[in-house]
């Protein structure tokens, strides 16, 4: 072998060794979940529920067709193939069953799961890892967070370690154990896709988003970090097909345990409440309110006699922080407020009329049901038209008092123009235009005449009791 060939040989050999070491290093970095699963599985349970429903298929003879007009042979033929009527007292009951998951958080038998797993159940059955089955008692449930606390009789039961969901970061490995489609102790894995996610109609939970495969039956089961600690409760998926599509959501264990402790001690959950309706600040709204960039929560509506009203918060305020914690998106505010107790102090940093201001108020307790404002009644006051393409009338004193409005105008007619383009409708109430409160139809017309062109202008609109700010631009 010549010297040049010998050098080439050693060069190739060295390259192969380096590549082999790199591959081995990458393989070594991949997690092994074996020990985690072995230690955690005994405390993960299968939950089955039974709900008794009335059998409404045939309840009385009024549901039977009239066969009296048929010949005897035909009548006998049809009667043989039809169910016989029963009296209402003879109605049978049928059962609806569902499956889910849960996990043990105390040695004496307390179990966490989802509210939707056990909702409306007449009987809850828990199957442990050793296949034994026990009836569970519902201690309490919180539909707003989708958390439920159960209790089974037992002692020295296996218990899961609880972590801190606030320490999670996007990109970290996570593991789920549950009973998808009834297959007990199924293990799936993935990564944290995002934290602090907000979902429609889920205002009080900053969800953990993952790509862990979650299917029917996984709900209520634990989500683990690599230390084997529970960091969340698997709750729901985003799907267009009905099956898993790579986007799943878990309730942070910090939130779940706060709910659990309140249910255990008081049977219900208390949350902080400001009494406001807020909306996202987009680019156009940021320009309209003089903000450097889209951020914060825009106050679109304030409930009469609520904490915000008593504390001096105003419609049009943009809330930038609460007790020093920044409000990057509007969805951040309900999470932070909900975590406060009634009576706690809340210091809000807001933008009002283009200037920063601090507003301090006392947090209230969230009511069982939010006040429902109905569509405002029509007024018979004289019309006023304007360059926006709407005909408006003023609110009378009775309407202002009934709906706690100091002013505003009702749209009676929408014509071709900017109003039609932004979706305004007859019956909508306009309370603010270009950050100015409207007290009369005449004032509305005057403000409309002075609106700037080619710049975002805000308008506060009340529709069916719900207020929001919208923006538009007037062309040259």
Swiss-Prot record:
Keywords: Hydrolase, Periplasm, Protease, Repeat, Serine protease, Signal, Stress response. It is an enzyme of class 3 (hydrolase). InterPro entries: PDZ, PDZ_sf, Pept_S1C_Do, Peptidase_S1_PA, Peptidase_S1C. The lineage of its organism: Bacteria, Pseudomonadati, Pseudomonadota, Gammaproteobacteria, Pseudomonadales. It is found in: Periplasm. PROSITE patterns: PDZ (PS50106). Residues 263-354, 360-465 form the PDZ domain. Belongs to the peptidase S1C family. Its main location: periplasm. GO terms for biological process: proteolysis. Pfam families: PDZ, PDZ_2, Trypsin_2. This is Probable periplasmic serine endoprotease DegP-like. The keyword Transferase does not apply. It catalyses: Acts on substrates that are at least partially unfolded. The cleavage site P1 residue is normally between a pair of hydrophobic residues, such as Val-|-Val. GO terms for molecular function: serine-type endopeptidase activity. Substrate binds at residues 217-219, 274-278. Might be efficient in the degradation of transiently denatured and unfolded proteins which accumulate in the periplasm following stress conditions. Residues 1-27 form the signal peptide. It comes from the Bacteria. Its EC number is 3.4.21.107. The active site is at residues 116, 146, 219. One of its GO terms (cellular component) is periplasmic space.
């Amino acid at each position: 072998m010549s010297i040049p060939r010998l050098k080439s040989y050693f060069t190739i050999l060295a390259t192969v060794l380096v590549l082999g070491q790199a591959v081995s290093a990458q393989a070594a970095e991949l997690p092994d979940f074996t020990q985690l699963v072995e230690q955690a599985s005994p405390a993960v349970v299968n939950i089955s529920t039974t709900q008794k429903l009335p059998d409404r298929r045939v309840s009385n003879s009024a549901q039977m067709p009239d066969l009296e007009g048929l010949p005897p042979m035909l009548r006998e033929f049809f009667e043989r193939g039809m169910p016989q009527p029963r009296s209402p007292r003879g109605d049978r009951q049928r059962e609806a069953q569902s499956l889910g998951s849960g996990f043990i958080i105390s040695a004496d038998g307390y179990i966490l799961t989802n509210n939707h797993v056990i909702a409306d159940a007449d009987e809850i059955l828990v199957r442990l890892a050793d296949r034994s089955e026990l009836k569970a008692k519902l201690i309490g449930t919180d539909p707003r967070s989708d958390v439920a606390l159960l209790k089974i009789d037992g002692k020295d039961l296996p218990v899961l370690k609880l972590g801190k969901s606030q320490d999670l970061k996007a990109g970290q490995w996570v593991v789920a154990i549950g009973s998808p489609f009834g297959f007990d102790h199924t293990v799936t894995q993935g990564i944290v896709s995002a934290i602090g996610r907000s979902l429609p109609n889920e205002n009080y939970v900053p969800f953990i988003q993952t790509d862990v495969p979650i299917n029917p039956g996984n709900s209520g089961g634990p989500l683990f970090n690599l230390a084997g600690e529970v960091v969340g409760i698997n709750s729901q998926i985003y799907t267009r097909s009905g099956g898993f599509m790579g986007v799943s959501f878990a309730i942070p264990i910090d939130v779940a345990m706060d709910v659990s402790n309140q249910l255990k001690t008081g049977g219900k959950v208390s949350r902080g409440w400001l009494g406001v309706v807020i909306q996202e600040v987009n680019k156009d709204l940021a320009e309209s309110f003089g903000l450097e960039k889209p951020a914060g929560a825009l106050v679109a509506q304030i409930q009469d006699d609520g904490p915000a009203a008593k504390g001096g918060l105003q419609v049009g305020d943009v809330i930038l922080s609460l007790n020093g914690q920044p409000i990057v998106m509007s969805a951040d505010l309900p999470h932070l407020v909900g975590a406060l107790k009634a009576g706690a102090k809340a210091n809000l940093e807001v933008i009002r009329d283009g200037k920063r201001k601090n507003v301090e108020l006392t947090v209230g307790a969230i009511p069982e049901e939010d006040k429902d404002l109905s569509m405002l009644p029509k007024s018979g006051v004289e019309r006023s038209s304007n360059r926006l393409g709407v005909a408006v009338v003023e609110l009378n004193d009775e309407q202002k008092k009934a709906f706690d409005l100091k002013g505003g105008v009702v749209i009676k007619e929408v014509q071709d123009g900017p109003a039609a383009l932004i979706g305004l409708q007859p019956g909508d109430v306009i309370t603010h235009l270009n950050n100015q409160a409207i007290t009369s139809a005449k004032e509305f017309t005057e403000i409309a005449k002075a609106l700037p062109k080619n710049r975002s202008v805000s308008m506060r609109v009340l529709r069916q009791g719900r207020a929001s700010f919208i923006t538009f631009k007037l062309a040259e």
